[in-house]
Design a protein with these regions (language model features):
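N-terminal Rossmann-like FAD-binding beta1-loop-alpha1 element of flavoenzymes
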Residues: 5-32, 336
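Conserved Rossmann-like nucleotide-cofactor binding loop
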Residues: 15, 38, 187
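Glycine-rich FAD pyrophosphate-binding loop
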Residues: 24-48
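Dinucleotide-binding Rossmann-like beta1-alpha1 core, especially the glycine-rich loop
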Residues: 48-107
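Active-site/ligand-binding neighborhood in enzyme catalytic cores
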Residues: 84-166, 174-177, 183
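Mid-domain catalytic core of redox enzymes
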Residues: 162, 167-270
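Conserved flavin/dinucleotide-binding core of flavoenzymes
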Residues: 240-344
Length: 344
């Protein structure tokens, strides 16, 4: 039995890492238990044949307070997407302002914007008005690694099986602490904490293709009004380090299950090019891309489920990096107020 920490955090996603950073800064000992081999949760990438491949379309918005306060974006060579009044272009007929923005928001929420709470839509609108999202060198994993780097006690490749009172039981050991924070995906969270409801998750698939035949202007985000692909961009035009060979690397997103040949046909239509010779690089089907946030759901759900047991993540906030990080911060602040009441 290990019991030398004040708080156990299950999951090293952005919410759990944020909570751990706050707690460690307050002098509260914390152990983070992560089932995978790296930090960041969904904020991760792979490197294949010199290409940086984010899992999903991963961009960082410098207007998000927690991202901004981390101070990491400038250190990681943050580069914004194309600037200007219209940083994206619409593929398809535009008759009304709704035709202009709803396809873009569909790519943000990975769902029909009409299914998303108006409160959440306003939060996202404000974030885009305040800052231009972009990429960092090394891909999404570079941010996650840097964000986790100051933390002193993270256990990777360790799966949590259950929580019994103040004890966390894993496939390696048992840990005991006065307080526990569950910072996992919502499906795992409901398996560990029966008191919370299941959250519906939106799925998506990200496709990567490369070409040596340059497509001019492809660094400007293409948003598709009607079609199986909802967006596409030459991600290496935004961040050259995403392709060490110099070939253009295209990232495209779909919400439906389609074949790779269908993706090529859509890419040909979007970019007005013969894509038959484009190299297929990778495909990432992400079944838990973002939590749905329907009308009536509060912007933030309570993070303390019962005394000493907290659940955090963007499914307890709103679907964004800021929502995840803020939920982790809320849990940490409540714990800090309990442990150090004079600091509240």
């Amino acid at each position: 039995m290990k019991s030398d920490s004040d708080v156990i955090i299950i999951g090293a996603g952005l919410a759990g890492l944020t909570a751990a950073r706050y707690l460690q800064s307050a002098g509260i000992s914390t152990v983070v238990i992560e089932g995978s081999d790296r930090p960041g949760g969904r904020v991760k990438c792979d490197t294949i044949d010199g290409f940086t491949l984010d899992h999903g379309f991963q961009v960082f918005n410098p207007s998000y307070p927690h991202l901004k306060n981390s101070g990491l974006l400038p250190q990681l060579g943050f580069t914004p997407m194309v600037t200007g009044l219209m940083p994206f272009r619409i593929v398809g007929e535009v008759r009304t302002p709704r035709d202009l923005f709803e396809p873009f928001l569909k790519g943000v929420f990975l769902s029909d914007p009409k299914n998303v709470s108006p409160v959440v839509r306003r939060e996202i609108y404000k974030s885009f008005l305040k800052g231009r999202p972009g990429l960092v060198d090394g891909g999404a994993s570079a941010f996650s690694r840097a964000y986790a780097e100051p933390l002193m006690d993270i256990h990777y490749n360790e799966t949590v099986h259950r929580i019994e009172g103040n004890t966390v039981i894993t496939d390696h050991a048992q840990y005991s602490a006065e307080m526990i924070i569950v910072s996992t995906d919502p499906v795992t969270a409901t398996q560990l904490v029966s008191e919370i409801d299941v959250v519906m998750m939106n799925s998506s698939t990200t496709w990567y293709h490369a070409t040596a035949d340059r497509v001019e202007g492809a660094g400007r985000f293409a948003v598709v009004k009607d079609g199986p692909l909802i967006n596409s961009v030459a991600i290496s035009d935004v961040k050259k380090s995403y392709s060490t060979s110099g070939d253009q690397l295209f990232s495209s997103t779909t919400l439906s299950v389609i074949s790779e040949s269908e993706v090529r046909r859509e890419l040909s239509r979007i970019w007005n090019r013969d894509t038959s010779r484009w190299e297929f690089v990778a495909q990432y089907e992400i079944k838990q891309s973002l939590p749905s946030h329907p009308a009536g759901k509060p912007l933030y759900s309570p993070v303390e489920i019962k005394p000493g047991l907290f659940v955090v993540g963007d499914h307890r906030g709103y679907p964004s990096q800021q929502g995840a990080m803020q939920s982790g911060a809320l849990a940490a602040k409540q714990i800090i107020e309990r442990v150090h009441p004079t600091r509240s």
